[in-house]
């Protein structure tokens, strides 16, 4: 499979992506990681208004192969949860970078996107040369 690694995303070691939008941060899971999971059957996410610390679990993604936790790459408050992926996990599987985002976070701390991998760094980590 050919994966997309858009330049506008930053990636955590645990395969979550971050997209900055108007001072807020959209969080999701990379195409590569979703593909590795296989058929997704269930998604559970924290509630809107939840305050999370860097590295804290914000949900689980269950597939026919495994159950994986997802982690927040920085501290912040959940201001939006994508209910669509909870109601229909296929959205996450079919479009993880688009309609399959998971949370929108407001962060009061200085979010250092430079601490996360850029698309080339992430691609070299997950796709053999």
From Swiss-Prot:
The lineage of its organism: Bacteria, Bacillati, Cyanobacteriota, Cyanophyceae, Synechococcales. Keywords: Lipoyl. This is Glycine cleavage system H protein. Residues 24-106 form the Lipoyl-binding domain. PANTHER family: GLYCINE CLEAVAGE SYSTEM H PROTEIN, GLYCINE CLEAVAGE SYSTEM H PROTEIN-RELATED. The modification N6-lipoyllysine is found at residue 65. It comes from Prochlorococcus marinus subsp. pastoris (strain CCMP1986 / NIES-2087 / MED4). One of its GO terms (cellular component) is cytosol. InterPro entries: 2-oxoA_DH_lipoyl-BS, Biotin_lipoyl, GCV_H, GCV_H/Fam206, GCV_H_sub, Single_hybrid_motif. Binds 1 lipoyl cofactor covalently. The glycine cleavage system catalyzes the degradation of glycine. The H protein shuttles the methylamine group of glycine from the P protein to the T protein. Belongs to the GcvH family. The glycine cleavage system is composed of four proteins: P, T, L and H. Its cofactor is (R)-lipoate. Pfam families: GCV_H (PF01597). One of its GO terms (biological process) is glycine decarboxylation via glycine cleavage system. Disulfide bonds: none annotated.
């Amino acid at each position: 499979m050919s994966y997309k690694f858009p330049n506008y995303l930053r990636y955590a070691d645990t395969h979550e992506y971050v997209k900055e939008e108007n001072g807020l941060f959209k969080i999701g899971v990379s195409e590569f990681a979703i593909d590795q999971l296989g058929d997704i059957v269930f998604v559970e996410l924290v509630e809107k208004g939840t305050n999370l610390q860097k590295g804290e679990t914000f949900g689980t993604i269950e597939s026919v192969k495994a159950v994986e936790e997802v982690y927040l790459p920085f501290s912040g408050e959940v201001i939006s949860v994508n209910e669509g992926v909870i109601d229909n996990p296929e959205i996450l599987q079919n479009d993880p970078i688009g309609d399959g985002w998971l949370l929108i976070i407001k962060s009061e701390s200085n979010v250092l996107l430079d601490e996360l991998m850029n698309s080339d760094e992430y691609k070299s980590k997950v796709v053999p040369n």
